[in-house]
Amino acid sequence: MSQYVSRLGRRSPAASPRLRLNRKPRRVAMLSVHTSPLHQPGTGDAGGMNVYIVELAQRLAAINIEVEIFTRATTAALPPAVELAPGVLVRHVDAGPYEGLAKEELPAQLCAFTHGVMQAWAGHRPGHYDLVHSHYWLSGHVGWLAAQRWGAPLVHAMHTMAKVKNANLADGDTPEPAARVIGETQIVAASDRLIANTAEEADELVRHYAADPDKVAVVHPGVNLERFRPFPKGRVPGPGQHGNARAAARARLGLPQDALIPLFAGRIQPLKAPDILLRAVAVLLDERPELRSRIVVPVVGGPSGSGLAKPEGLQKLAARLGIADVVRFRPPVGQEQLADWFRAASVLVMPSYSESFGLVAIEAQAAGTPVLAAAVGGLPVAVRDGHTGRLVHGHDPAAYARVLRDFADNPDLTPRMGDAAARHAQSFGWDSAAATTADVYTAAIQSYRRRVRSHHG
C-alpha cells in the first residue's frame, strides 16, 4: 500500500506540504450516468455505488465542497434538479428512453448525456466546477470530455473493472465486452487521479491498465455509523445487552428468536452468488436435518444484471434444493430497515465472485453482525478473518456450510464476533473518507495546473 496515497499517508509529489497550502475545490461535478443516487439500493443497477455517492457527497458538502451530481433521467416526471442535501444537487439529464434501457445499451447514449451535461453548464462562467469526479467507466468517458471542455482535472473511481470481473466470472454470467476494457484503459490514461477502494484494487489498476502508481490514491469507503449500529439511534445499551438488540430486531421483523439466520442482502445476480448460500444451506441440512426447524434464510434484494433474465431463478433453485420452506425472499428495503435486518441476522453471507470493497460487509459489522464472505477483492480488508467474521477461499458450498455449522453449534459466536465487528467498523467513518477524498482533489488540481503550465511553457 505504501506506494499509493492512502488515508493521508505518504503523499505523492503532487500533494507535498507546500502544495497542501492551496485551497480545496469549491465545487465538484460528480457523474453517475447509469444509476441515480436517489434510487433504492439492492435492485436493478442500484447498489453500493449509490450509497457511496450519496454519503460521500453529503460529507464533502459538510466540509464546504459543493457537489452537483449528474445522472440519467429514468422517468419524465423527474424535475431537472433535486436538492439531495444542503450543498448537494442532483441534476437529471435526458439521454435515451426513460425506461427499458439496459446498462449494456447506455454506451450509445453517452453523446446525448454529454450534451445534456454541457447544456447544464452553459450558463455558468468558466471555472464554475473546480474538478470532475466520475464514477464507473460509463461516467468516466463523459467526465473525460467534460473535464477537457471545462479546463478542470478529472478524478475517476472505477468501482468495478472489466478485466477483474472477467477473470472471476460466476457460472452463467456474461463477460464484460471488449469495448468496456478499451474504454477503461482510455479513462485511466486520461485521469489526473484514480481513487481505489483498497491497495489490491490499486495494484489491479497498475497491473491490468498500466495506471501510473503516483496517480492512484487508496481511499477506503465509509459506513454511516449513525444509521448502522448495534442499537437503533436513541437506544443506549447497557453492559452485555447487544443480544437484546438482536432479539428486538427479530421481533420487529417477525423472525424467531432462537433461529440461526444467515442473511443475504444485495442485488440478486450471479456475481453476488446468492445461490452459493442456498446450496450451502442445503448441504448443512443434509448433514444436520435437526437444524431445519430453527434456520431461517432471508434473501433481501432484487434481481440485477444478468439476474434480470431469470428473476425467479433463485426461488426455483430453493425449491429444487428442497429448502423453499426455510428461505424467505424480501424486496429491497430502505437503509433504516436494512440496518434492522443486519441486527437480526446471525451472520451476513457474501459469497461474491468479485467485490471492489463490499460496502454491506462494513454496514453489517457496524450493526454488530459478523460476516461470512468470499476472500475476494476488498472483502479481506472489510472483514478480519477469525475476528469479525470468516473468509472462505473459493465457492464450494460445503466450505460455507461448515462455517454455518460453527455458528449453529456455538451460540456465543455471533455476539462475540459481532462485538468485535462493531468495533472494527468504527474505523470506516464517511467523514474520514471525505477528508481523504478532498485531499486527493487538491492533489489533482495542483497536478493539473502544473501540467497546463508545462504545456504552455
Curated annotation (Swiss-Prot):
InterPro entries associated with the record: Glyco_trans_1, Glyco_trans_4-like_N, Mycothiol_biosynthesis_MshA
The species this protein was found in: Streptomyces coelicolor (strain ATCC BAA-471 / A3(2) / M145)
Family matches, as HAMAP family: MshA
Record's note on what induces expression: Transiently induced by thiol-oxidant diamide, under control of SigR. Also induced when mycothiol is oxidized or conjugated.
Subunit field text: Homodimer.
Superkingdom of origin: Bacteria
EC nos: 2.4.1.250
Family the UniProt entry places it in: Belongs to the glycosyltransferase group 1 family. MshA subfamily.
GO MF terms, alphabetically ordered: acetylglucosaminyltransferase activity; D-inositol-3-phosphate glycosyltransferase activity; glycosyltransferase activity; magnesium ion binding
Binding site residues for UDP-N-acetyl-alpha-D-glucosamine: Q40, P41, G48, R267, K272, V333, E355, E363
Positions annotated to bind Mg(2+): F342, R343, A345, T369
Designated name of the protein: D-inositol 3-phosphate glycosyltransferase
GO biological process: mycothiol biosynthetic process
Functional summary from the UniProt entry: Catalyzes the transfer of a N-acetyl-glucosamine moiety to 1D-myo-inositol 3-phosphate to produce 1D-myo-inositol 2-acetamido-2-deoxy-glucopyranoside 3-phosphate in the mycothiol biosynthesis pathway.
Keyword line: Glycosyltransferase, Magnesium, Metal-binding, Transferase
Catalytic activity annotation: 1D-myo-inositol 3-phosphate + UDP-N-acetyl-alpha-D-glucosamine = 1D-myo-inositol 2-acetamido-2-deoxy-alpha-D-glucopyranoside 3-phosphate + UDP + H(+)
Ligand binding (1D-myo-inositol 3-phosphate): H34, D45, A46, G47, G48, M49, N50, K103, Y136, T160, R180
Organism taxonomic ancestry: Bacteria, Bacillati, Actinomycetota, Actinomycetes, Kitasatosporales
